A protein has these predicted regions:
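Extended, low-complexity regulatory regions
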Residues: 58-62
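Terminal beta-strand-rich extracellular "head" domains
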Residues: 41-50, 63-170
């Protein structure tokens, strides 16, 4: 292997690929900070919950191309409460395979989410998490809900609940 040192790369200014620098078939461009790949999805139907145990809301797979990549996880939870009870408390959880990377495993405390109104309500909760999985094997990311202390039950609406995963080069 040799090293090619240049000051400027310039694409042709005319033709079918005018002003484009092309990477040959079967090769990849690796530039820190760029998005290598994106996958996204949503549950096919509404997902109901009614207990204090962890409820799987949605899973999505990605296979990183580089073990140095970071995965930016973007999630939206469209939560509807079936509540006429005094409280509904819980936590929004993200797992990488079986490892908890966001949220809480225990059932104590008030949780991330708390509603004490005793009314039926809809909430839209969005957040992101930057993960460093250090692998090129397939990863399964899981969105979940875990009730804490009280749970009156509810559902995650398929039209407002989704997840996107972006592999970011380092």
């Amino acid at each position: 292997m040799g090293t090619l040192t240049v000051q400027t790369l310039q694409a042709p200014t005319s033709g079918a690929n005018a002003n484009k620098l092309l990477v040959g078939s079967g090769h990849t461009l690796h530039a820190a900070g760029h998005v290598i790949q994106t996958v996204s999805g949503a549950p096919a139907t509404d997902v109901a919950y009614s207990t204090l145990t962890e409820t799987n809301v949605f899973t999505l797979n990605i296979t990183p191309k580089f073990n140095t990549s970071k995965i930016l996880i973007l999630v939206n939870y469209g939560l509807y409460l079936n509540s006429s009870a005094a409280y509904d408390r819980g936590d929004f959880i993200i797992r990488r395979d079986t490892t908890l990377i966001r949220g809480r495993d225990d059932g104590g405390g008030t949780g991330y989410f708390r509603d004490g109104s005793g009314h039926f309500k809809a909430y839209m909760t969005s957040f992101n998490h930057l993960d460093s999985p250090a692998t090129t094997s397939q990863i399964t990311y899981k969105m979940a809900w875990k009730g804490h202390t009280y749970t009156a039950g509810g559902s995650f609406d398929e039209n407002y609940t989704n997840m996107s995963l972006m592999e970011i080069a380092q």
